[in-house]
């Protein structure tokens, strides 16, 4: 009988203090959850700012790549007709009337400049 009374008294004390600790635990859990949400929010904000920075870097790289991939204007090679209706001659060539093709087609041709 004495042991039953001791166990009942321990049960009552444990229940009383257990409820008090449970309330404290609930408050601590609320604080932990709020802190986790704050950390998640801050992490999300940091990720968003990092994403914006990466998008800015990517857009500048794409602009540079687009500039690099742009083709130069086409030019005419050696012995190709040139003039106002045709593309310009490539570097190292000049648009001149020649005796060979010019008299037949009545247009100047891209030729290497004479050294004389």
Curated annotation (Swiss-Prot):
Entries under InterPro entries matching the protein: Toxin_22 (IPR012627)
Membrane-spanning residues: none
Signal peptide residues on this chain, from the entry's feature table: 1-20
Propeptide intervals in chain numbering: 21-74
Pfam families xref list: Toxin_22 (PF08092)
Lineage: superkingdom: Eukaryota
Keyword Disulfide bond: yes
Keywords from the UniProt entry: Cleavage on pair of basic residues, Disulfide bond, Ion channel impairing toxin, Knottin, Secreted, Signal, Toxin
GO CC list: extracellular region
Disulfide bonds: 75-90, 82-95, 89-110
Subcellular location as annotated: Secreted
Tissue specificity statement from the Swiss-Prot or TrEMBL entry: Expressed by the venom gland.
GO molecular function, one term: toxin activity
Keyword Disulfide bond applies: yes
Comment on protein domains: The presence of a 'disulfide through disulfide knot' structurally defines this protein as a knottin.
Functional note: Ion channel inhibitor.
Family: Belongs to the neurotoxin 14 (magi-1) family. 06 (ICK-Trit) subfamily.
Record's protein name: U16-barytoxin-Tl1d
């Amino acid at each position: 009988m004495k042991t039953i009374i001791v166990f009942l008294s321990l049960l009552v004390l444990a229940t009383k203090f257990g409820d008090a600790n449970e309330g404290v635990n609930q408050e601590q859990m609320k604080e932990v959850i709020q802190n986790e949400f704050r950390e998640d929010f801050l992490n999300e904000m940091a990720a968003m700012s990092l994403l914006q920075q990466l998008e800015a870097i990517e857009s500048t790289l794409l602009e540079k790549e687009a500039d690099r991939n742009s083709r130069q204007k086409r030019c005419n090679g050696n012995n190709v007709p040139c003039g106002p209706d045709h593309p310009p001659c490539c570097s190292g060539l000049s648009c001149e009337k020649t005796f060979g093709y010019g008299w037949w087609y009545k247009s100047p041709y891209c030729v290497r400049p004479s050294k004389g």
